[in-house]
């Protein structure tokens, strides 16, 4: 009986050591560089471009470095007064400036991020500025901007236009790439 208790005790100690080491390993996750590649404009699919900022915030909160690359048709969503009608009516705002975060999303973000509702942005354009203040770097594909005939001065101030070679560097240096 004593040998059985001793054996059982050793098993418990061994399992405790194993699970204890796993818990320590899980806590020591190294920060990574995430590149969020946002390619779909607000006009094409609002769910995709609007999900990117939420993921960016969650990654920053988890201690990761985050870069957002606005590409393809999404460059139109960060351009002031894009389109013929926009130039006449909203020449000083972007599509993201005009897109409000639904109240239920704001409430959910406040709960998930552990902040007050007052700290949550009201529009997606404001959200980009909020992320930039948190250390997120935001770039835009200047070649796509040229193809859409976008003047760099009309791009949201949070977005820095970059050339293709710089984009290649972003893709090569990222530990993980998330595409929206």
Q: What is each residue range found by the language model?
A:
Residues 1-10:
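Bacterial N-terminal signal peptides that target proteins for export
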Residues 9-19:
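Bacterial N-terminal signal peptides
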Residues 23-26:
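Boundary at the C-terminal end of the N-terminal hydrophobic targeting segment
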Residues 37-50, 78-81:
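Short, glycine-rich nucleotide/cofactor-binding loops
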Residues 48-63:
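Histidine-anchored nucleotide/phosphate-binding helix
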Residues 66-72, 139-142:
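Short internal beta-strands
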Residues 69-86:
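Acidic helix-start/capping segments at beta-turn-to-alpha-helix junctions
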Residues 86-138:
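A glycine-rich helix N-cap at a beta->alpha junction
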């Amino acid at each position: 009986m004593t040998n059985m208790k001793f054996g059982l005790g050793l098993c418990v100690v061994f399992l405790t050591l194993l699970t204890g080491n796993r818990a320590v390993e899980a806590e020591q996750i190294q920060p990574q560089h995430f590149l969020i590649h946002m390619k779909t404009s607000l006009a094409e699919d609002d769910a995709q471009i609007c999900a990117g900022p939420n993921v960016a915030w969650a990654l920053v909160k988890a201690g990761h470095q985050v870069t957002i690359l606005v590409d393809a048709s999404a460059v139109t969503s960060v351009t002031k007064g894009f389109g013929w009608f926009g130039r006449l009516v909203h020449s000083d705002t972007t599509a993201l400036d005009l897109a409000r975060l639904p109240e239920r999303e704001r409430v959910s973000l406040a709960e998930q991020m552990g902040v007050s509702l007052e700290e949550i942005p009201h529009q997606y354009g404001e959200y980009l500025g909020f992320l930039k203040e948190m250390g997120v770097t935001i770039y835009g594909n200047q070649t796509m901007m040229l193809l859409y005939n976008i003047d760099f001065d009309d791009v949201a101030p949070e977005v820095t236009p970059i050339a293709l070679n710089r984009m290649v560097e972003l893709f090569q240096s990222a530990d993980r790439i998330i595409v929206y």
